[in-house]
Each structure stands twice: as C-alpha cells, then as structure tokens.
Amino acid sequence: MKLKIDLNCDLGEAFGNYTFGGDQHILPLITSANIACGYHAGDEDVMNETVQLAKKNNISIGAHPGLPDLKGFGRRKMDLTPNEIYNLVIYQLGALSGFCKINHVKMMHVKPHGALYQMGARNKEIAHAIAQAVFDFDSNLIFVGLANTLLISEAELVGLKVASEVFADRRYEDDGQLVSRKKTDATITNTDEAIQQALKMVLENKVVSKNGKIIDLKADTICVHGDGKHALEFVTQIRNELMKEGIDIQSL
C-alpha cells in the first residue's frame, strides 16, 4: 500500500497591525491549516481572511486553540482547571466554526497550540478536558496530537478519530516528548537534517532522540512551520523529498 502523509502548518497568527508568517505563500504547499482562534494569536479579521485563503487553495481547515496569552504567544503554561480548559477550547472552536460557516467550508480537525499542547501531552486530566471539548463540540472532528502521548490516548478514549503528529524541525527527548523551546537545541535549523528526520518518521515510523535513542512512533501528519526567513524553502524541500520517495501528500 502506498504511503501517505498530511502536511500541516499553524496559520492565521497575525493580530491587528502585527503580521506573522507568510500564510499566502505556505498554503499551496501544505494539505491542512491549523488556524489560530484569537486567544494566543489571530483575531476576527485574520480568522476570516485565513479561512478564505485556505478555501481558495483547497486546504483542509482546522482549529488551533491555545491559552489566552497573546503576549506569550500561548507558549507559557497557565494554572487552569480541567473545566477552564474545556471551556476555553469550546469558546475557540465556536469562533472559528462561525467563520467556516459563513464561508461555506467545513472544519475538519483540531490541534491544540503551544503550552496547551504540551500540557495535554503530559497531563491526563488536561488531555481529557481538551479531547472531551472537541468531542462535545463535534464528534466528527479529527483530533491532532503529539504521537505516543496522552493527547492521542485520551482523544481515542472519548471516541474521536485521531491523527498522530510528528515534527520535521523539532528534536525529541528520550520519552518521545518534544525538547522544550527554552532549550537551545529544541529546533532543527539544518534543512537536510530535518528532511532526513521527516523521511525516517514516515518511511520507518521511527525518530532518533537528541541522545541517540530510537523511538517508535506513528506518523499521520507532519507539522511544518511557516515563520522564519527560510520557511518557504524549508517546506518546499521537505514536500519535494517526500514525493521523490513516492509518498502521497494528502489531507487527513
């Protein structure tokens, strides 16, 4: 059976007069867009515009809910109860769903952002609260979470279809978690290294941790990042190398 992979990217992260990333350039290269819902980034105008751009490029649309922390870009942990987590996810799904409705497109998936994503990957109660909110909002949504973590197992437990996410440009700890962005070795900046990591994850279902440990994982979707001065070249090369290996690039 021919291998396939989804390429997802976090988009719609501008806010007011502040621009972020090159969404219009990245969109034609990916298959799924995770659109910020106004808490960590994005606003009503940006959400509507990004939904329209994704529709124009025939890209699968998903919600990218985060913690209410614009200044910290949703990357700082917050001490919240599971009920507060549940409510903030519902709130953001409702916001993006409204813009999908008026543009006559369907919201297909949900991927938590930043600290919310990391908290859910390590904390069962938080993972369950996120997953339950998604299920209660729309049980047909696909839940995107870090492979081999509580995000995936709790989403499966509540009855959601899941997509295990891997990262081409992030390094992994020995336990399969992502290396914290606070550490200098968290990201892979060398394009060739990122391509080799992506190919290994898709072709072999394995990744090598920063300490050299081989970790088994399932790869349904690869996250690529649209920000940074070499982002366009980076995404283009990863896509091209995957296709050279005969891997189909298609949405979830």
Swiss-Prot record:
GO terms for biological process: carbohydrate metabolic process. It comes from the Bacteria. CDD domains: LamB_YcsF_like (cd10787). HAMAP family: PxpA. Forms a complex composed of PxpA, PxpB and PxpC. This is 5-oxoprolinase subunit A. It is an enzyme of class 3 (hydrolase). Belongs to the LamB/PxpA family. Catalyzes the cleavage of 5-oxoproline to form L-glutamate coupled to the hydrolysis of ATP to ADP and inorganic phosphate. Its EC number is 3.5.2.9. Keywords: ATP-binding, Hydrolase, Nucleotide-binding. Pfam families: LamB_YcsF. It catalyses: 5-oxo-L-proline + ATP + 2 H2O = L-glutamate + ADP + phosphate + H(+). Gene3D superfamilies: Glycoside hydrolase/deacetylase. One of its GO terms (molecular function) is 5-oxoprolinase (ATP-hydrolyzing) activity. InterPro entries: Glyco_hydro/deAcase_b/a-brl, LamB/YcsF/PxpA-like.
